Amino acid sequence: MSDKVENVSLMTNSIGNNGNPFGSADYYVNKDKILNTGLEVWEYEGGYSYHGKSILIDDNISVIGSFNVDMRSVYLDTELMLVIDSREINSQLNEAMESYEHIARKADADGSYDNPYDVEPVELTPYREKRMKLIKNFILWTRYLF
């Protein structure tokens, strides 16, 4: 998609800032694949877990809801997304999303970061790192079963 559409970006929690140990492990395992899609990936470092689910298309379509864009949300959970055709709402949502970008660093495919807002990364504590690696190595393969 990012080859055909300009200005496609994704905001997610950094590994150190992620309050979801399974999400953190999944991102750790798949980060290179995600970055190699050509998406502009921003890692939120706000000190509490980012849980937003919003999409902006052009300057008039806004998509807001609880859908996690994963198989669990498709088949198990009761999730929804609201699609709104409104330039005013799109502009307001864009401003809100940009405010999160100011507390994030842009991850690059080479492993480095662009940090235009001089954001201090959230440290991955030794406990959380061990927990994430345990999940990555022994539990993550089961994520498709739930």
Regions found by a protein language model. Give the residues of each.
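PLD/PLD-like phosphodiesterase catalytic module centered on the HKD motif
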Residues: 1-146
